[in-house]
């Protein structure tokens, strides 16, 4: 099984207070799609990931497959599974292409 892992050269952190504020706004029905909750530092550049992107990034720990990540997120977010799966796949494909994620080497 192909598990996803973050590029170890990328320094990152979860902005906990900001994440909680974004979650509160989400519960209130506000649009939070542009709100960054995870900060990545790469080649002197700072990048922000929104709530869903940050959750995906955090779950790419080398232990989980794409399907396992979708399963976890489907329990957290009130979204149709097929739509969520397509969004996660698109996001992961983008990060794979950028070299920010890769597939963990199989230990089998």
Predicted regions, residues:
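Acidic, low-complexity/disordered tracts enriched in E/D and polar residues
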Residues: 1-54, 58, 104
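Long, charge-rich, low-complexity alpha-helical segments
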Residues: 34, 42-108
């Amino acid at each position: 099984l192909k598990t996803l892992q973050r590029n170890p050269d990328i320094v990152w952190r979860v902005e906990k207070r900001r994440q909680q504020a974004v979650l509160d706004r989400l519960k209130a029905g506000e649009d939070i799609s542009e709100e960054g909750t995870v900060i990545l530092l790469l080649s002197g550049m700072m990048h922000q990931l929104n709530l869903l992107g940050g959750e995906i990034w955090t779950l790419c720990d080398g232990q989980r497959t794409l399907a396992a990540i979708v399963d976890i997120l489907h329990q957290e977010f009130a979204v149709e599974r097929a739509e969520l799966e397509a969004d996660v796949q698109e996001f992961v494909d983008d990060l794979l292409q950028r070299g920010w994620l890769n597939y963990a080497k199989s230990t089998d």
